Amino acid sequence: MSEDTSQPTDQQAGTALRRGWTTGACAAAAARAAFTGLVSGSFPDPVTIRLPRDRSPAFALAVHACGDGWARAGVIKDAGDDPDVTHGALVSVTARPGAPGRGVQLRAGPGVGTVRRSGLPVAAGEPAINPGPRGYIEQGIAEAAAALSAPTDVTLELAIEDGERLAAQTLNPRLGIEGGLSVLGTTGLLVPFSCAAWIDAIQRGIDVARAAGIEHVAGSTGRTSEQAVQAYHQLPDEALIDMGDFVGGMLKYLRRYPVPRVTIAGGVAKITKLAQGFLDVHSRRGQADLAALAETAGRLGADATCREVMATANTVAEAFDRAQAAGLPLGDAVAREAQQTALNLIDPACSEVEVLLFDRRGQRVGRAGWARD
């Protein structure tokens, strides 16, 4: 795949990470090629599409075929250096003549999911093809139709090879998307390890929970804390928000779109960072201050030796172990400090917050009970 303006790399950002293309961009390329094959009997290879921000990538076709009343084309998704589950998957579109005056009609084929719950950008019952890709798929068909002097009335069935199996590795089952993957991509360009993509998933999870009338959501930093908080509160899957490192991103969205009860659950290291004011608790944003953690222990009665051992520990978990050995309720104290950070971000008139700390085995080691301010 190539682009007439620049290669899909991350050189502009000064990194070695290679950019890729979203499933939506691949589907748009396959759709334009399939439509052209349906109308003219020949397939453009490579096929060029227009994306937002003046990008015009060209995609090589991996498959193309046509028969009586249908044409199919597909491209292999290149996710660049992003660990996307669909990297290397065949994204294909089968085009068939549509009803006169109906324009472009999109259908979910094998491996593409169908929305079953409200709260997402696509209505329940519709193929899980987000508004961004829908827009540039339709734009590509309009441009191809104009070039061929043909109407735009066409039915496009999108498919993703092995998509139903791959979807189990995504948030789709929790969001109420059944049968396969979503076709995503606001701009069509896939930036490796994009924070924006994760935050968007957090927001969609909150939207689905609100639409389902759920009044208690739990944001967790990882799988262990998610399983632990679900067991602790007996929450349905729809109430679980995989916030990862983006505690601030979740809380800021909840300020705009509140839920009455919000639990923040995580391991000792990440919740300690939240307690110390970090809103993004990834290690790249900095390390927890062990000296400050030792001071917290001091306020609980830790002696000088205990504080020194904690301040010079190799990890937060090691410092916690020392405090627990001394019989100090450090987990509860850190949870209260983390809760105060969180309360500064939400609307106290609309939500109350609880913080839970878990160790690596999923055992609760700290809690700050429900509070609004």
Curated annotation (Swiss-Prot):
GO biological process: anaerobic cobalamin biosynthetic process; methylation
The EC number(s) this enzyme carries: 2.1.1.195
Reaction catalyzed: Co-precorrin-5B + S-adenosyl-L-methionine = Co-precorrin-6A + S-adenosyl-L-homocysteine
Pathway: Cofactor biosynthesis; adenosylcobalamin biosynthesis; cob(II)yrinate a,c-diamide from sirohydrochlorin (anaerobic route): step 6/10
Keyword Protease in annotation: no
Keywords assigned: Cobalamin biosynthesis, Methyltransferase, S-adenosyl-L-methionine, Transferase
GO molecular function: cobalt-precorrin-5B C1-methyltransferase activity
Domain of life: Bacteria
Broad enzyme group: transferase
Keyword DNA-binding: no
SUPFAM superfamilies reported in the protein's UniProt record: CbiD-like
One Pfam family named in its UniProt record: CbiD
Family to which the UniProt record says this protein belongs: Belongs to the CbiD family.
Protein name: Cobalt-precorrin-5B C(1)-methyltransferase
Gene from which the chain derives: cbiD
